[in-house]
Amino acid sequence: MARSLKKGPFVADHLLSKVEALNARGERQVIKTWSRASTILPQMIGHTIAVHNGRQHVPVYVTEQMVGHKLGEFAPTRTFRSHTKGDKKARY
């Protein structure tokens, strides 16, 4: 179920204040965050946000196509190690 339009998108307050401060100064810095549930807003375009994936911070460069998505979508939490290739001893 989608979030109500009257509430607006969720963005962590500390993240939004850091982005607005960098925009006011005209700087581009990596912003570390643990807030995977925050929605990407147009103010964040051009910034690099390091999103925590449970083990480390994954740098995510925000582009125009990402607006409206959540930060956690771009920092995968699971690493896929491929299926075993050459184990044929169980076959006859």
Curated annotation (Swiss-Prot):
Pfam families: Ribosomal_S19 (PF00203). InterPro entries: Ribosomal_uS19, Ribosomal_uS19_bac-type, Ribosomal_uS19_CS, Ribosomal_uS19_SF. The keyword Phosphoprotein does not apply. The keyword ATP-binding does not apply. GO terms for biological process: ribosomal small subunit assembly; translation. Keywords: Ribonucleoprotein, Ribosomal protein, RNA-binding, rRNA-binding. GO terms for molecular function: rRNA binding; structural constituent of ribosome. HAMAP family: Ribosomal_uS19. This is Small ribosomal subunit protein uS19. It comes from Cyanothece sp. (strain PCC 7425 / ATCC 29141). The gene is rpsS.
